[in-house]
Amino acid sequence: MGKVNKTDREWQRELSPEEYRITRQKGTEPAFTGQYWNTKQHGTYVCRCCGAELFSSDAKYDSGCGWPSFFRPLNGSVIDEHEDLTHGMVRTEIVCHDCEAHLGHVFEDGPQPTGLRYCVNSASLQLKTQEKNDEGTYP
């Protein structure tokens, strides 16, 4: 896809106020309130800002934290990591590689096979649902 460069004004026109606050101003939605924290639908989670494919529903799990959680991204090049020292903590922020939208944080307390928990704001995501094929399975 390539890098996406837009002005703040362009992002404000394209996103809801909540999406803008979270993705462009590094906000966080309250736990257990986002659209995808408890969804079980199959598909691909894409960046709300630029549409880059980020996570598969196959890697989503219930971490109990109140935000959508994944144990791995679709591939290692879709997400960038930055040190986050805000709120008196040391955390690892995750952002979309293509547009630098704030997604959430990654923690080292996830399940196997990675041991990682990508904790993502629903407002940073959009789910492209997937239907079962003729055999009754997901492609």
UniProtKB/Swiss-Prot annotation:
It catalyses: L-methionyl-[protein] + [thioredoxin]-disulfide + H2O = L-methionyl-(R)-S-oxide-[protein] + [thioredoxin]-dithiol. One of its GO terms (molecular function) is peptide-methionine (R)-S-oxide reductase activity. The active site is at C119. GO terms for biological process: protein repair; response to oxidative stress. Residues 8-130 form the MsrB domain. Zn(2+) binds at C47, C50, C96, C99. The keyword ATP-binding does not apply. Keywords: Metal-binding, Oxidoreductase, Zinc. Its cofactor is Zn(2+). Binds 1 zinc ion per subunit. The zinc ion is important for the structural integrity of the protein. Its EC number is 1.8.4.12. It comes from the Bacteria. Belongs to the MsrB Met sulfoxide reductase family. This is Peptide methionine sulfoxide reductase MsrB. It comes from Acinetobacter baumannii (strain SDF).
